[in-house]
Amino acid sequence: MKTGISVLTRSMALMAMLFIGVLPISVMAQSILEGRVTDQQGKPVEVAQIVVNKSLSTITDKNGRFAINGVPSGEVEYYVNCLGYKEQRGVVAIKGKRTQLDIRLSRLALNLAGVTVTAKQQAMGSKSLIDQQAVRHIQPKSVSDLMQLVPGSLTSNPSLNDLGQATVREISSNDNNAMGTAVIIDGTPISNDANLQAIAPTMHGKNSAPNATDMNNQTTAGRGADLRTISADNIESMEVIRGIPSVEYGNLTSGVVIVKTKSGRSPLEAKLKADPYSKLLWAGKGFSLGNGTMNVGLDWSQSYADTRRHYKGYDRITATMGYSTIWGQGSKRPVTFNLNGSFYSNVNNYKHDPQMTELQLEYKNRNVGGRLSAHGHAQLAGAFLTGLDYDVSGQISRTVDDHRDYVPSPDGVISNSMVSGEFPAAILNKAYYSNYRIEGIPLNVFAQVKVNKYIKLGHKNDFTNVKAGVEYRLDDNRGEGLTFDMAAPPKAGSAQSYRPRSYQDIPALHNLSFFLSDVSKLKMGAGKSWQFDAGVRLSNLFLDKEKSGQSGIFVVEPRANTEFTFLTKENNNFFDQLSISGGFGISNKMPSLFYLYPDNAYFDNVSFSALGTDGSRLAVMTTTVVDNTVNPELKPARSTKWEIGLNARIGRMKGYVNFFKELHRNEFGYQSEFIPLTYTKYSIETGASQLAYNNGKVTYVNQQGELKTAATSTGYEIQTWGRPNNNQRSDKYGIEYSWDFGQWDAIKTSLVVDGAWFHIKRKNTKDYLSYVQYGYDCIPVMPAGTGTVSDRINSNFRFVTHIPVVSMVFTTTVQVVWYENTRSIYEDNDGNNLYTLSDDGTRYMVAPLYFYDIKDIKDIKDIKSIDWDPDFASNPRYKQMVHQYMLYAFKNDRVNPWALINFRFTKELGNHAEVSFMANNFLAMSKYHKNKYSTSMRQLYPDSYFGAELKLKF
């Protein structure tokens, strides 16, 4: 730990000196930019945000007034946004000591021109902005529904029955991608690092149930945060950083989802959403409170995966509040203050099936929690610094998995020993009910402070904004963990058994970070400019060395984005703007508690069992405990990204194309390890009675009345368990694009075409144990390199028809998948195939690297590895260890092009009502893809889906 702390301390000191070194640079005259923001009727707009050159910001007070101190003279760009109003951008010339800027905003309404209901590309970097109008039109149930507007995504029907995971640049779901996607709400990251909701990670990995019920995948342990806890109706806007994020954001690999909730005044609104599978009610209002505004919301939803099976249901209640104000408006150092809170209660049920009711079975997952955060900005005019941003938050939840299972045929002997040894055991040879509970109480604390120095450079609109910050995160779990009656375990007599485990014994995670960045914009001549965002982030995760095997993990993350604009109206007559952008960045996702502190592995072997009555009934169990299941070499998952893109605007048309390359290394998983088990086996004579176990011996009385000691022999067995490991990697290449053709006025319709080509190659990176069959006395170790390669090219043609005169907008989306291909691979690090063709040409084969021979082993110390000899492939005893594959196993599985049509409609009914309708695959297209080799089938089109929404305003 001392090494990590010293490196972090020295690095922070160096970065602090670099930051302090730029403070005296600014010598330009500074001014106060002040003014008033009103609506079209001249009424003040409260809590409107004003941002200058993406660096200086404030909000308006209850009179609509604002003031930004320390604005250097010259031209500056600004933008203003507020809940319920259309965003406004412009340029203002700063002159003298005070510059007046009065802004008049238009309310968002469908009778106004310029409605945008698709994701917008943000400058410099791969970022998609989904604003108020798009959120309103998409009719989401959760945050994950909004991800469909990101280029490369395909249509999926809104559902609350499945986990809501955010993935970036993915073809199919992937746990490491979801885990590496940071979700930030109002400046606060939603942490899932303290989630331990799994029954036995060393045995079942991430599942919360040992059996294949619909409830064993409701946990997000080892995955990303469940986005169903966020009310989609309380979202004002959302930004998705697909590429390289600023160094302000940490503990991630895939991307960032930034959610801004509603703040400011708004009319009382009530919504009713309904579809064949669910119903949702929401009400919210924003109102003045003292010198600020309060915005509150409440929603209730109920969803079923199948309307014929109401025993598979999901219920959600969320409540949100947000208070915003500004202190010291008009002073040299005004401070904005935002307080946001939320409460949620989610319940998954699986219990009302008639058959389950008859068997008295019940599975339930409950998640109740809340978040509270305070964040804001302080202007520091007259000081060495320009401003200070602060963010403090706390999150706590209680997740409970309750399972009542029926164990129809137990193996007979159970043990409650928590330590290794030989002990008397209980006999359980009748069917029974097992009740077990997994309780997790994850607690997360986050604090971040950022300071910046805004410096006006020589040209009238050139600037640099240097920013430094420090961040602290705490992740802990205070739940009781896995609990059950040891006399009625979830499984009985298994070779690997369950034991209760309290999460309160697991150390908390402490993560300290420091970052330094610079955002600059420079004029490079007529019509040319260059801007960049570059910085470095240092992070240290402090660990309990005694329990994790390491004292800490230290990472350095350099990142940079840049954009060079070389054509504008100033130097050509065709392009309004043409620029090239690029970036490079390294990001790390620290391992969570789930991977750092796995449970012990328990193995129970029956040494003796006699199912008699009274004196002829006895059981002895040998328990072996593996208590060193941690991986002291566990590393953070790391991503390295490169990007280059082209952005253009020609009249009413605009768009971009972006190429990216991503290398993801050290991704998390569980790796099998074997353990040789040795135990004493006791045998007695027929007709024995008065069985007893004392001092490590089984005694009995034979039929002649003689006291005897049971004969002994040694039993041997090999079992496996899972250890956390960095055993996966992903390589990604692709092209993302979007082109907005603008509106054709004659038909009031615009066309936006977006899509992507994704190429994703995934494979395991660790040699692994292979199970052949029960009773086989060799354990092969296979080479790493199994995986898949997937490609997909898709386009979305979004026809947006907006008719202001009737306050209506409808969108017809034609989704086309031009190319889709998947194949399995088995290759080495250089890409060479590890499989070879058999001598008769009927199959492919992969031989082990080595194996363990346990035949006739009398002592576990005698087990040794034997390198594989090619001649073993023809040996009847050893050839079973060779993996065999059909000739088509590594062939391409290509899907023919396919398309579907979706429709969304929104209509305002006066000033007090709005109706919306959506239909996915409304032509009821149905197509299954059949693998021509394996004949397996999979559905291409989502099921037809119809939903409606009614909103009332008061």
Each model region followed by its residue ranges:
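Short, acidic, small-residue-rich periplasmic hinge/interaction motif at the N-terminus
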Residues: 36-43, 48-51, 81-85, 95-136
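Extracytoplasmic beta-strand/coil segments of soluble accessory domains associated
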Residues: 144, 148-211
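C-terminal beta-signal and adjacent terminal beta-strands/loops
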Residues: 209-211, 664-666, 816-885, 895-898, ...
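Short acidic/polar hinge/loop motifs at secondary-structure boundaries
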Residues: 188-241
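Face-selective signature of the C-terminal outer-membrane beta-barrel domain
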Residues: 327-345, 363-547
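N-terminal periplasmic accessory domains that precede
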Residues: 100-104, 143-146, 165-167, 183-184, ...
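Transmembrane beta-barrel wall of Gram-negative outer-membrane proteins
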Residues: 235, 271-302, 310-395
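Gram-negative outer-membrane beta-barrel transporters
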Residues: 526, 681-828
